[in-house]
Amino acid sequence: MDLKNWYDRVREQLSRLDFPALWAGFAPCPFALYTHDTAVLNGEMMPRPAEFYGNTSVCRQGEHLAIWDMEADPPADVAGLAASLVHEMFHSFQFRCGEQGWPDDLVLAATEPQPAFLALRAQEHRALAGGAPLSEVLALRQSRAALQPELLLEEARMETIEGTAEYVGRLALARLSPAACEGACARSAQRLLQWPDLRRGAYDSGPWLLRRAAEEGLPVPVHPGGEPIADQLARQLSLPEVRLQPELLAEAERRLERERSARRETLRALLETAERTEGDFAVCGYDPMQLRAQDGLLWSGSFLALRQADGTVRRLFGPCAVRLADDPHRATALFVPRM
C-alpha cells in the first residue's frame, strides 16, 4: 500500500474544505495514516508509533492527531477517507474545547436495556428515518428516560460525541462528493431500521437529529459542554403524547432473548478452554465496538488493557473475558484462552 500517495491525496481533499463553515470554531488538526508497521504523518514516513491503535484522535507529544488504520479499514475512495478523518479531527476539536460529556462505554456494554426501552428506541429510529417531526422523535426519547435514565444518558452522550462528529464528517463529504454523501445518508437511514446496539446506533441517530434540527431551523449549541444535544433540542419544542407500538415491544423481547443466548454461547466457548487468573483489575483500555456483557462477565473480542494491583498494565489481544465487580470498570478475574 502506497501510504504516502494516499496521504497526499487526502491532504488535497482536506484543503478544499472550509472547516469553520462545517461547525463554528472547527479547525483541522494533523492526521496520520498507518499500517501494522508504518505510518505517515506530516508527509513523512516513520515506524508506526505505539499509541496508534484504531481510527480515532490521539495525543502524541502534546498534539492531538486524527489517525486511520489503512489495513483494518481500507478506504473505498479518497473523499470517503477524507470525510472519515474530518470525523476524527472533530474529536480532537472536542478535546481542545474541553468537552465534558464523554460517554462511559463500559456502562453501555454492561447494562441490558429493558424491552420497553429497546422498543421505544426502535420506534424513535423509525420516526427519525421516516422524516417525522423532531418533536415526535424527542417525545419518544422522553418516554425512554422514564424507564432507564442512566442508560439513556450514556447513549445520549455517545450520540453527542460520536453523532456530532459523524454529522460534521457527512457535511464534509457533501462538499467533496455529493453523490457519496447521499448514499451514506441512505445507508444510515437503513441502519436505523435494523435495531443497532446502543453504541453503534448513536453514530446514525446523532447525525439525523442534527440534520432534522437544521431543517426545522432550531439552533444547535456549538459546544454542548456536557449536556446531550437531544436534551437541549427538546427544551425548544412542545412534545406531543406518544404511545409504544405493541408489535415493537414483542419484537424487542424476542431480540433481547436471542442476544442473551448468543452472548452466553460466546462466553461458554471461551471459558471452556480459558485459563483463569484471580485478581483486582481496573479496565483501562478496550475496543468499544468489541465489548459484550452477560451474567456478570465482560467479553472483549480484540483488545483489552487491565491495570493490575501492582500498577502494571496487562494488554491482551484477541478474545478474552473478565468477571466484573459491582463497578463495571473493575474486574475480579481474567479468562484468557490457553495457547
How would you name each of these model-derived features?
Residues 83-96:
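Active-site recognition of the HExxH zinc-binding catalytic motif
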Residues 16-20, 143, 239:
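Surface-exposed polar/charged interaction patches
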Residues 70, 221-339:
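Non-catalytic terminal regions of proteins
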Residues 1-80, 312-339:
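A metal-dependent hydrolase signature that marks the N-terminal structural subdomain at the beginning
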Residues 37, 96-151, 155-181:
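Post-HExxH zinc-binding segment in Zn-dependent metallohydrolases
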Residues 150-179, 186-246:
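Active-site-proximal alpha-helical
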Residues 79-83, 182-186:
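Alpha-helical scaffolds flanking conserved acidic
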Residues 6, 120-124, 164, 205, ...:
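Alpha-helical structural motif
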